[in-house]
């Protein structure tokens, strides 16, 4: 795969040129009103900033494309990029403004008024249903409108930079189709993510330990299958652990269970044993009376969840201290660690201990460590860990997993030309 770099674009010169940058501004927000929201984790904004500033500093007229959340193809106040754009403007050393629309007359007017070295964030691309359309023609038409924005008063050829690694697994108009319409390059963030993930897939230093958590085992099946025979150990926590316990014949009470995946998990356990990959499952679990921050809870053996005072109504919400210690020892002995998915409901203080223990073990480890984006990145920041405590915190949750699954990523395919 041959991808053109940002340095190549800068060497070619961007003074006075429009450069459309697909950034990842899909950040968590909080607030009582849809119109009074603030960014609670600006990690992705900070990660997107260097490319935007490099281009603006070199005299480009930067048009930032991004999405936030999952709007249903129409404007919704709670999904506006306004909070993200405001935070970007606070952090940036160059002028940043927000357009009221993504395309159309008002967006064209705002783009035409952009001066060299200025940045315009276009409104959420997913406000247009064509962004995520399965119809190739619809997506291509929307991409053409986006490309047209770069022709607003400019006499130099526009360019496209994909710096949204968290979206490269999507065949969307601003990720795939737009890259086919303009000279295209990949940004520093995408390059860094690829370099890091290739260390995990090409020749990881061993022992190579993978820590998987999160709610559903079905979300991780493909990556688990691809890791069998490649990872030395796979540590399983989070809601997905209960399907593994059920596959071993244990009762799991009212814990999250994907019964339709039990046979698949049984198959993976057998294949892993034959391939020399060991699954390390919890030996103790924190079981609660209900899914709530203030729920009564007890520590029980993982193989006897229904032995708690809650009986079959008990819900497992975190791994226990014995498991946390065992996982920490595995991480301490590793040379390479990839972690994706929290160990429990970290948003509730009573059930955050397992996730905190894994994060601390990674922070203390001398191994090359990668925190796989999404909920894992949010968890370590929520629990007070600095980004530099880990080797790398990925901005791509789903994209990272699909890369490790060996899947083709449309956003990268479009750049390979």
UniProtKB/Swiss-Prot annotation:
Catalytic activity, EC: 2.7.2.3
Biological process (GO), any one: gluconeogenesis
Catalytic activity: (2R)-3-phosphoglycerate + ATP = (2R)-3-phospho-glyceroyl phosphate + ADP
EC category: transferase
Subunit details: Monomer.
PANTHER family per the UniProt record, alphabetical: PHOSPHOGLYCERATE KINASE, PHOSPHOGLYCERATE KINASE 1, CHLOROPLASTIC-RELATED
Sequence similarity: Belongs to the phosphoglycerate kinase family.
The name this protein goes by in its record: Phosphoglycerate kinase
